From Swiss-Prot:
It is found in: Secreted. It comes from Rattus norvegicus. Belongs to the AB hydrolase superfamily. Lipase family. One of its GO terms (biological process) is lipid catabolic process. This is Phospholipase A1 member A. GO terms for cellular component: acrosomal membrane; extracellular space. Hydrolyzes the ester bond of the acyl group attached at the sn-1 position of phosphatidylserines (phospholipase A1 activity) and 1-acyl-2-lysophosphatidylserines (lysophospholipase activity) in the pathway of phosphatidylserines acyl chain remodeling. Cleaves phosphatidylserines exposed on the outer leaflet of the plasma membrane of apoptotic cells producing 2-acyl-1-lysophosphatidylserines, which in turn enhance mast cell activation and histamine production. It catalyses: a 1,2-diacyl-sn-glycero-3-phospho-L-serine + H2O = a 2-acyl-sn-glycero-3-phospho-L-serine + a fatty acid + H(+); 1,2-di-(9Z)-octadecenoyl-sn-glycero-3-phospho-L-serine + H2O = 2-(9Z-octadecenoyl)-sn-glycero-3-phospho-L-serine + (9Z)-octadecenoate + H(+); 1-hexadecanoyl-2-(5Z,8Z,11Z,14Z-eicosatetraenoyl)-sn-glycero-3-phospho-L-serine + H2O = 2-(5Z,8Z,11Z,14Z)-eicosatetraenoyl-sn-glycero-3-phospho-L-serine + hexadecanoate + H(+); a 1-acyl-sn-glycero-3-phospho-L-serine + H2O = sn-glycero-3-phospho-L-serine + a fatty acid + H(+). It comes from the Eukaryota. The gene is Pla1a. The active site is at S166 (nucleophile), D190 (charge relay system), H260 (charge relay system). InterPro entries: AB_hydrolase_fold, Lipase, Lipase_LIPH, Lipase_N, TAG_lipase. Residues 1-24 form the signal peptide. Keywords: Disulfide bond, Glycoprotein, Hydrolase, Lipid degradation, Lipid metabolism, Secreted, Signal. Its EC number is 3.1.1.111.
Length: 456
């Protein structure tokens, strides 16, 4: 206080202010970009659309640089000569930042030399799902306007890769539609099903929205779309009921969201790990598990598609086929990848009833099992076994003959047959390994045999 001396007090404060301004001119400007985080909304104020575009770079993967105006982009670390990857999240019921986004951004920056931009539309995706759907067109227009600024800086349409999660996949599809399908790539991570399964091609993600469109389906019986929407559609574990996810509703929120979000975690794992998440074209998951689809010749000419950043998913054929359903199995936790093998058992004599044989691969303290059925009056039964160990680390196979507990008069006659296996894709007979001698199986008694398979 300056009691009774207001003029003196004013002069002192003015001098201090002048000194602070003058001294600040001697401090070199900071080179650190200002970091901006995702917005937080709530049910009362989260339905009105408010978009942020946040740029992340390898030099500071935890710092999102707000790039909305042309000047923001020019003054940022954005590199127009690199590819650009946009991440678009989906519906945010509680108005919170996606829990997976930081890990996703870091994985992308490590895996690709590219600009990574997260589209934050927490405001607009919160509250009721249907209000978020109503914001999709407006959001798509805002993203399209933002991309036009990047194109003015020299970015090519073909270098833009949109990765959309759930509802964000259809946002990406609409943006691609606005650019007449000339964007480089769109990846849909379990594209949303409600309101979109019967939507027109203009309203949802489809193969015409980019030069290459892929979708990973993990929750087709609940929150995800059940129809193919890309050039290649991965139906992981059949597209529903992912291993490790709760099977009963008493698990609460995890029961509702686990299958749906598995697509995100699979993609992150594909970015972080080298083991391939390879899939195989087939008419259905049931047919795939039955061993009816063993290679990728039709329609990919032997190049099996893989989840991840590999160009066009590893598909080399031209022109690209559309809406191809491909199937793969996974484990319950990261890195999720498995090796798929065909297993076959050929009976020496036909039987008048179905024959069930349990096949177990043993190697390095890891076991994998599958049951195959030989229909009555048939000699051959086959199936697909998924195993974590590479083929050359499978040391033994255990075979066990089962009979149905529902049959009153049980035929316990032993069976005799030959066992063979081959890693997928089965492109030639040279990969097939058979147990040299016929195997005699008695009911419920396990038989162990050595296996020697080459690494592939």
């Amino acid at each position: 206080m300056c009691p009774g001396l207001w003029g003196t007090c004013f002069w002192l404060w003015g001098s201090l202010l002048w000194l602070s301004i003058g001294r600040s001119g001697n401090v070199p400007p900071t080179t650190q970009p200002k970091c901006t985080d995702f917005q937080s909304a709530n049910l009362l104020r989260g339905t009105n659309l408010k978009v942020q575009f946040l740029l992340f770079t390898p030099s500071d993967p935890g710092c999102g640089q707000l790039v909305e105006e042309d000047s923001d982009i020019r003054n940022s670390e954005f590199n127009a000569s690199l590819g650009t990857k946009l991440i678009i999240h989906g519906f945010r019921a509680l108005g919170t930042k996606p829990s997976w986004i930081n890990k996703f951004i870091r994985a992308l920056l490590r895996a690709a030399d590219a600009n990574v931009i997260a589209v934050d539309w927490v405001y607009g995706s919160t509250g009721m799902y249907f209000s978020a759907v109503e914001n999709v067109v407006k959001l798509s227009l805002e993203i399209s306007r933002f991309l036009s600024k990047l194109l003015e800086l020299g970015v090519s349409e073909s270098s833009i890769h949109i990765i959309g999660v759930s509802l964000g996949a259809h946002v990406g599809g609409m943006v691609g539609h606005f650019y007449k399908g000339q964007l480089g790539r769109i990846t849909g991570l379990d594209p949303a099903g409600p309101e979109y399964t019967r939507a027109s091609l203009e309203e949802r993600l489809d193969s015409g929205d980019a030069l290459f469109v892929e979708a990973i389906h993990t929750d087709t019986d609940n929150l995800g779309i059940r129809i193919p929407v890309g050039h290649v559609d991965y139906f992981v574990n059949g597209g529903q009921d992912q291993p490790g996810c709760p099977a009963f509703i008493h698990a609460g929120y995890s029961y509702l969201i686990c299958d749906h979000m598995r697509a995100v975690h699979l993609y992150i794992s594909a970015l972080e790990n080298t083991c391939p998440l390879m899939a195989f074209p087939c008419a259905s998951y049931k047919a795939f598990l039955a061993g009816d689809c063993l290679d990728c010749f039709n329609p990919f000419l032997l190049s099996c598609p893989r989840i991840g950043l590999v160009e066009r998913g590893g598909v080399k054929i031209e022109p690209l086929p559309k809406e191809v359903r491909v199937y793969l199995q996974t484990t319950s936790s990261a890195p999720y990848c498995v090796h798929h093998s065909l297993v076959e058992f050929n009976l020496k004599e036909k039987r008048k009833k179905d024959t069930s044989i349990e096949v177990t691969f043993l190697g390095n303290n890891v076991t994998s099992s599958v049951k195959i059925t030989i229909p009555k009056d048939h000699l051959e039964g086959r199936g697909i076994i998924a195993h974590q160990n590479p083929h050359c680390q499978i040391n033994q196979v255990k075979l066990k003959f089962h009979i149905s507990s529902r049959v009153w008069r049980k035929d316990r006659t032993p069976i005799v047959g030959t066992f063979c296996t081959a890693p997928l894709p089965v492109n030639d007979s040279k990969k097939t390994v058979c147990i040299p001698e016929p195997v005699r199986l008695q009911v419920s008694m396990a038989v162990l045999r050595d296996l020697k398979m080459a690494c592939v």
